[in-house]
Each structure stands twice: as structure tokens, then as C-alpha cells.
Amino acid sequence: MNRTATRVLSSIEEVREALAGPGRVGLVPTMGYLHEGHAALIRRARAECDTVVLSVFVNPRQFGVNEDLSRYPRDLNRDLAVAEAAGADLLFHPDVATMYPAGYATTVAVGGVSEPLEGSSRPGHFDGVATVVLKLLNIVQPERAYFGEKDWQQLAVVRRMVRDLNVPVQIVGVPTVREPSGLALSSRNSYLTPEQQARAAILSRALQAVQAAAAAGERDTARLRQAGLAVLAEEPEIELDYLAVVDGDMREKAHVENDPLTRVLVAARLFGVRLIDNVPLSPAERRLSERESRNT
């Protein structure tokens, strides 16, 4: 598809008509309020695909009771500007009735990787994620779909779903984009003041402390966690949900093994805002992490 202004489409029929021609299609699923992290996904798709489809849909089925669905930031004009600058061809912006019409009754539940950590803290969250992602994959039928590594467990859930259900798509993980402070970019950062965002970078510092302990030879998971917990204890406003060292199947173990998918994940509430982050632990994956984009 020749590069022109990004087209905004709201119906499934419009999307399928626009994608009727030949060429590799890349999908970037988002909930909107785009930032540089999303732009990195779009640029990666642009470099690898002939047509890039960005979806913007605040999916109600992945929000729990008393979560922030009603106040989740929305700004389609801002999203369109980011999409065009990064190189998206199509912006698919369906409403809830398009994605979940009257009588809709199907939910996708991915076992195993979806159950601990975020799955335990936010019951039903990954069912909503898996359901909407599978719908988007069926609507767009891309060769590749791009997800940020910041949502590491979500990436694992999507990969497992695609594998188990034989969906013909390659799932591409894109490294986390961070502020110079180390804070992982997130649409929910908009809830925080600049001072609060600076203090929220303690999550990144805690993860780095765990990495450093592992690099020094520590293999006991409890002691690795303690290195991170000691950093988090410096912030009086933090309400920690979890700090976990997990393998590729999201399982916590007593000792770190030589698994390239070993990851350190953290979730906490700071100033009333729930934030998540993660970094790789193994040397090979850590070298990849050192090449993460930064929002400078």
C-alpha cells in the first residue's frame, strides 16, 4: 500500500475491503492514548510489512469491577497524529457494539500462563485480552502482530493462545520504551504528575537491582527478590502487588535456571495508579534489553 494519510475505519467490513489486496499485513493492537512506546510498535511493523493496521479500542472486557474503564484516557485526534507520524496505513476504531454485538456470548480463556500474577490480581483480565485479540486477528488476518514487552505476561498469553488455537500469525514482541528516568512508558502515566512519575521510576530501579544481584552470581529467588524489595522500601507511597522472578511459563521457582525467558516482573500501586514493569534476567536476554529504546 502506498503511504498516504492514515485512514480511520470503524467497521469490520471497511477493514476487510481495505485489506483485500496483496501484501504482508501487520497489526498493532492498542487501547489508544498512544505514546512513544506505541509508536515503536508501529515503526517496527512499518519496517516489516506492506500494510500496517493500528487498532484503537478500549476493551471493556479486560477491565474489572472498580478499575479505570470510565476514566481511561481517550484522544482519537492525538492517536491519529501518532499513527500517521509512525507510518500506520489504517486506524481501526470500532465501537463496543461492533466488537460485542447484542447476543455476544463467547470468551477465550487461556490456561496456565494467564493464572498467576496479573491473572490473580485482576480476575478475568486475560480472558478479556485473549478474546479481543483473537477477534482482531480474525478481522484483520495479519501475517504479524506487534505487542510491547512491557506487558510481558500479556505477550505470553497471546503467544500461547495463538499456538494452541493454530492461528496463522507471528507474534512479535517489541522492547519496552522508557523515560530517561527508567520509567516504562504507559498510557496510565498520564494519571501522575511529573514529580510522581519521577518517583514511580523506583520500579525500574528495583528491577535493575534484581538484575545486578543475578549478574553478581545470586541464584536464590528469595534473595534476588530481596534485592528489589530493598529498593522499593525507599518509597513510602508504594503498595506492592508482586515482585516475581518467573520462567517462560510464568512459574516462580526457588532457584533461577539458565532459561533465556527468565523475567523479573513487578506490579504496584503508586499514588493511586497501578503500574507494571519487567526486565529480563538471563545474560543473553539482558544484552537485548540494553538496546531498549529510550524516550530521550
Swiss-Prot record:
| Protein name per the record | Pantothenate synthetase
Q: Which pathway does it operate in?
A: Cofactor biosynthesis; (R)-pantothenate biosynthesis; (R)-pantothenate from (R)-pantoate and beta-alanine: step 1/1
Q: Specify which residues bind ATP according to the UniProt entry for this protein.
A: 31-38, 148-151, 177, 185-188
Reaction catalysis annotation: (R)-pantoate + beta-alanine + ATP = (R)-pantothenate + AMP + diphosphate + H(+)
Keyword Nucleotide-binding assigned to the entry: answer is: yes
Q: What does the protein in this record do?
A: Catalyzes the condensation of pantoate with beta-alanine in an ATP-dependent reaction via a pantoyl-adenylate intermediate.
* Misc note: The reaction proceeds by a bi uni uni bi ping pong mechanism.
**EC numbers, comma separated:** 6.3.2.1
* Taxonomic classification: Bacteria, Thermotogati, Deinococcota, Deinococci, Deinococcales
Question: Which gene underlies this protein?
Answer: panC
Query: For beta-alanine, which residues are the binding ones?
Result: Q62
- The entry marks the following residues as binding (R)-pantoate, namely Q62, Q154
Signal sequence annotation: none
Name the Gene Ontology molecular function terms of this record.
Answer: ATP binding; pantoate-beta-alanine ligase activity
| Cell compartments where the protein resides | Cytoplasm
